[in-house]
């Protein structure tokens, strides 16, 4: 009789993380594990194994044998923002500059997970600031979006966190952030509205106090 592999046996017998190619490209993830990462991954694998059983699946069938490992690895990637400090990223790329007009990086691709259902939401972020003696490397604005996105989120908080990190480090005359995203928790379940888009904004400084500055930003992101 074939012995069923229990969640604890997954940890004992699983392959190292250099692992197999499942054909979807997930084997290209960063597979370097610390001891703590390994323990976390083992716990995630056991949880996924149990979930598969609870939804009525057989975790031992061929197509699911490596699913706990793959899901655990995916979760490590999708939540890696918990282990990064966005303000430190900004601090590393600050430059003194007299430029005092708007700096806008628009259409930054964004992928995150709703903390209520752990389903993805994705879309675009538009980030602008008006310098006050300091500018930052443009890629760091996109990196700030990425770090906060790679956490369990609600879009409203995500928008504010991006604004606040930039405001805290650069101390500019103002920051503006708009996020437009589609939430799969509204598409795959619940109201099942396929074409719904959620838009959130967070402003500070002159983007709050000057209607013309705010209006310029909103016009630019709609082009």
From Swiss-Prot:
Which top EC class applies here?
Answer: hydrolase
Q: Name one GO cellular component term.
A: cytoplasm
| PROSITE patterns per UniProt | GTP_CYCLOHYDROL_1_1 (PS00859), GTP_CYCLOHYDROL_1_2 (PS00860)
Which one of the record's GO molecular function terms can you name? zinc ion binding
What CDD domains does the entry give? GTP_cyclohydro1 (cd00642)
**To which pathway does this protein belong?**
Cofactor biosynthesis; 7,8-dihydroneopterin triphosphate biosynthesis; 7,8-dihydroneopterin triphosphate from GTP: step 1/1
Protein EC: 3.5.4.16
- Top-rank taxon of the source lineage equals Bacteria
A Pfam family hit: GTP_cyclohydroI
Question: Its GO biological process terms?
Answer: one-carbon metabolic process; tetrahydrobiopterin biosynthetic process; tetrahydrofolate biosynthetic process
What is said about its interaction partners and assembly?
Answer: Homomer.
Record-stated family: Belongs to the GTP cyclohydrolase I family.
Q: What's the name of the protein? A: GTP cyclohydrolase 1
UniProt organism field: Chlorobium chlorochromatii (strain CaD3)
């Amino acid at each position: 009789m074939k012995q069923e592999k229990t969640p604890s046996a997954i940890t004992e017998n699983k392959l190292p993380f250099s692992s197999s190619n499942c054909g979807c490209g997930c084997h290209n993830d960063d597979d370097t594990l610390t001891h703590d990462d390994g323990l976390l991954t083992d716990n995630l694998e056991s949880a996924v194994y149990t979930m598969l059983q609870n939804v009525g699946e057989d975790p031992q069938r061929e197509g699911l044998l490596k699913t706990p490992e793959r899901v655990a690895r995916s979760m490590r990637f999708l939540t890696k923002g918990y282990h990064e400090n966005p303000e430190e990223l900004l601090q590393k790329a600050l430059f003194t500059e007299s430029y005092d007009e708007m700096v806008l990086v628009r259409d930054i691709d964004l992928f995150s997970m709703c903390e209520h259902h752990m389903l993805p939401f994705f879309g675009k972020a538009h980030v602008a600031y008006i310098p006050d003696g300091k500018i930052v490397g443009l890629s760091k604005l996109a990196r700030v979006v990425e770090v906060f996105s790679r956490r369990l989120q609600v879009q409203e908080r995500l928008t504010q966190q991006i604004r606040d990190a930039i405001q805290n480090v650069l101390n500019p005359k103002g920051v503006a952030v708009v996020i437009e995203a589609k939430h799969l928790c509204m598409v795959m379940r619940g109201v099942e509205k396929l074409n719904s888009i959620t838009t959130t904004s967070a402003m500070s400084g002159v983007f709050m106090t000057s209607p013309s500055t705010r209006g310029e930003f909103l016009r630019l992101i709609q082009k």
